[in-house]
Amino acid sequence: MFTLLEDRSRRQFLNNADILKPNLVAPGNLIWAAWSSLGTDSVEFQGENFAMMSGTSMAAPHIAGLAALIKQKFPSFSPAAIASALSTTASLYDNNGGQIMAQRAYSNPDINQSPATPFDMGSGFVNATGALDPGLIFDSRYDDYMSFLCGINGSSPVVLNYTGQNCLSYNSTINGIDLNLPSITIAKLYQSKTVQRSVTNIAGEETYRVGWSAPYGVTIKVAPTRFCIASGERKVLSVFVDAKMNSSTASYGRIGLFGDKGHVVNIPLSVIVKVTYNTTTNV
């Protein structure tokens, strides 16, 4: 059984809650790996050539190595395309077909685990084999991310410091919900919203069937529900989301694209605040 450890890095960022975090999860507990004998970080491993450690610093190298393999197979892939391949092919279940569980910060040991949500595991547990054959990818341009960053209130000095580019050169901005990510996260759903995502086929021609499970308190529809896509072709999917109750509790669903050649594309859908009517009162 896979269990996600309670960790400070396993958090949804509330400042930009329309972007799912974490993206996905990878092996990071008790990882036995090479270690510099000159390292002084841990006294117990001084002089050793191998060490066993846990944490995000152990999970990240797994993802970095797999990203390098994807780039080797698909040299033209952008960072966004690589991230998409990793996310859309991630596993939702453990090797025995059981649910991935998440540790909770409860004092009672009998209730300190529950099924993981996208806010715990992102798209799921990284699948190395699947990531090298994703079928469809969600790609984005560098300028898309720059437009998003420049649209964050007060971000201009930070963007200039880290990228050397002035936000004044970007005439329009992009909201987090509109980035072409392999996930959909809506922080505040007022009545209804339409979200679009574009997919690009990096495999052979294939026909996809679209299925979904809606988050609690929400109804969704996806158009088209079936499409044929040629190699290299791009298709736009429209996701219509409607609130059916007033709630501030996050709920989760998924959209799946099922290809007739065996490709399966997994898209987590999360909605936090749901409002079915306009609560603004004129005085």
Please place each PLM-identified region on the residue numbering.
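Loop-rich non-cytosolic ectodomains and luminal regions
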Residues: M1-V283
